[in-house]
Amino acid sequence: MLSAAFITLLRSGGNQVKKRVLLSSILLQDHRQATPACYFSTSEARCSRFDPDGSGQPATWDNFGIWDNRIDEPILLPPSIKYGKPIPKISLENVGCASLIGKRKENEDRFGFAQLTEEVLYFAVYDGHGGPAAADFCHTHMEKCVMDLLPREKDLETVLTLAFLEIDKAFASYAHLSADASLLTSGTTATVALLRDGVELVVASVGDSRALLCRKGKPMKLTTDHTPERKDEKERIKKFGGFVAWNSLGQPHVNGRLAMTRSIGDLDLKASGVIAEPETTRIKLYHADDSFLVLTTDGINFMVNSQEICDFVNQCHDPKEAAHSVTEQAIQYGTEDNSTAVVVPFGAWGKYKNSEITFSFSRSFASSGRWA
C-alpha cells in the first residue's frame, strides 16, 4: 500500500513533473523534509518502506533503475500514485528503430509507433511477403483501427484481436476491388504491442515476427512463431484441407508455399487454414527490472538468438544505437532478408549492461524465406 508520505511527495512534486523534472531530483531537493522512515546520503537516497520488485527486501531508490538512468524520463504521476511506485513516462522520442534491406531487391518490412491516447502507446512491426501491399496496408490502417476500438473496449487483448481481424477483412475487400491480382497473394506478419499507464503491456502477433522483454538482463519471449512445425498449427491446416510440404532446406510450408500459418492477407490460403486471429500476451512491467521491449522481424530472429539480442542492446548507450546494432549484427551474421528492430526503453535501461556477450555457435546461415 502506498504510504501517505509518498503520496504527499508525489503530489508536492506535481508541478516539477509537468516541467519534466525527475522525481529523483525532487527527492534530493526535499531531503531536509525526509520522514524518519527514510534517510539520505550524498551518494544515494534510501527508503526501507518501498519494495519495487516484490522481493520483500528493503529497497533503495536506485533499485528502480530510473534514478540514475542515462535516459531522463519524467514520472507519470497518476499511475505512480495508483500503483504505489514510480512509473516512468516512455517518451517516443527515445524509441529506437532501424530497418535494413539486406540482399533483397525490396524492403517489405514496415514499423511504427505512436501515442494513441493519454494512457496508451502503440508499437508495431510488419514483415511483408509476396510484395509490400499487405504490410503497407497494416502500417497505414492498424494504428487508427486500434485507436477507434479503445473507447469501446477496455481489454487490450480484445482490442488487438478485433483490430487484427478487422484489418484482415478490410485488406481482403481492398484486394478484391483492386485490378492488381498480385494483392491476392500478398501477406504480412504483424506484431503489435500496446502499453497502458506505463505498466500494462499487451502484445498480439501473427506470423514469425517477435517481441521480447529484457528483464534482469534475460530475454522473456512474448510471442511464439506461427509455423507449420507447431503441432496445433499443422493440425488446423490439415483440418481445413491444406497440406504441409518441406523445401530443399527442410523448412515446412503451407501448401508448399508459405512458411507461416497465421498472417494478415494471403487471401488465396484462407481456405487452407491460414488465419489472421492473433495470439496475445499480457504482462505487468516492473521498471526496477525491465530494461526494454524489442520487436524484430525474422531477418534478425533467424540469425540472432534472444539472449544475444538482449546482450547487444544492453551494450548500447541509447535505443537508437541499439536498433541499428541489432540489425547490422544480423547482416554480419549472414542474413539475406530484410531486418527490422524497434527498441522501447523502460525504467531499468542501462542497469544490466554486461561486459561479456555469449555468442551462439549453432546459428543457421540458411537465408529465411516466405516462399518455397
From Swiss-Prot:
Summary of the tissues where the protein is detected: Highly expressed in the heart, kidney, brain and liver and to a lesser extent in testis, lung, spleen and adipose tissue. Very low amount in muscle (at protein level). Also expressed in the thymus (at protein level) and the diaphragm. Significantly reduced in hypertrophied hearts.
Record-listed Phosphoserine modification sites: S248
Keyword Mitochondrion carried by entry: yes
GO biological process: branched-chain amino acid catabolic process; regulation of mitochondrial membrane permeability involved in apoptotic process
Record flagged with keyword Hydrolase: yes
Keywords carried by this UniProt record: Hydrolase, Manganese, Metal-binding, Mitochondrion, Phosphoprotein, Protein phosphatase, Transit peptide
Residues the record lists as binding Mn(2+) 1: D127, G128
Transit peptide residue numbers: 1-29
Annotated EC: 3.1.3.16, 3.1.3.52
Names of required cofactors: Mn(2+)
The protein's name: Protein phosphatase Mn(2+)-dependent 1K
Organism lineage: Eukaryota, Metazoa, Chordata, Craniata, Vertebrata
The encoding gene: Ppm1k
